[in-house]
């Protein structure tokens, strides 16, 4: 038997730096053709808002031209915006949701 120590003398600890995912805003863009009731129903369905919350978002977009609907990770924001926009397109409305990075 030999007295050889096979254990390393130094303890190397790898520090893994985990960054938080970048967040993106989903934005409702106002148009003059999509019925308000339909916008509210999409907001309730896709973004799980109450009737009051959805109505406030819809009215803000109507008055200001745009309104932030919510803030999500990039993938979730893009998916929700696409699904909500597609819901309008399926009914023949120009309903538009966009995304942009949160600053």
Swiss-Prot record:
InterPro entries: ClpS, ClpS_core, Ribosomal_bL12_C/ClpS-like. It comes from the Bacteria. GO terms for biological process: protein catabolic process; proteolysis. Belongs to the ClpS family. PANTHER family: ATP-DEPENDENT CLP PROTEASE ADAPTER PROTEIN CLPS, ATP-DEPENDENT CLP PROTEASE ADAPTER PROTEIN CLPS1, CHLOROPLASTIC. Binds to the N-terminal domain of the chaperone ClpA. Involved in the modulation of the specificity of the ClpAP-mediated ATP-dependent protein degradation. This is ATP-dependent Clp protease adapter protein ClpS 1. The lineage of its organism: Bacteria, Pseudomonadati, Pseudomonadota, Alphaproteobacteria, Hyphomicrobiales.
